Amino acid sequence: MRINIEPDEHIVASLPKVWGNEVGLMGFFKKSKEGVLVLTNKNIIFVPRFVPLIPREREKFFGGDEAKVTVMDNYSESDLDEDISEQSSSLLLPLDSIANVENVESRKVNFLRIKCIFNGKTKTYDFGIAESVTNYPIRQPLRFHNVDWNAWIKLIKSYL
């Protein structure tokens, strides 16, 4: 039985090893998190979760400097629902609240920027793929890959 996602909701695309961060003043006080970015037919969901990948799997998801539209193997809707329940900092963005999806260049790196409207307030989130990460004192990205997000942007806009 699903608690956080609806019974008729299904995964359209998923991308592991994504770093998410809120843009603006509130983002300054929060650390960016590594997780899985999931597009369902009703929501965009970011679940903070470490997923180990071998180099061959990295090519499947973001090879050729492009964020590819694919689904993670062995990651179902029930797994997603369980991860959302376990991680209180999961981010659920209903597709009807999304105002804009775009590719933004910052520090010579492309990020996926999603703007949402909640209760009349606009919140902005950036998502990127880390090239190198530091593990001490906490796991944080040092550099990001310059990834083309156009395939994801087109897919998200087709569901809006």
For the regions a language model picked out, list residue spans one by one:
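Acidic, Ser/Thr- and proline-rich intrinsically disordered linker/docking segments
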Residues: S32-E34, I45-L160
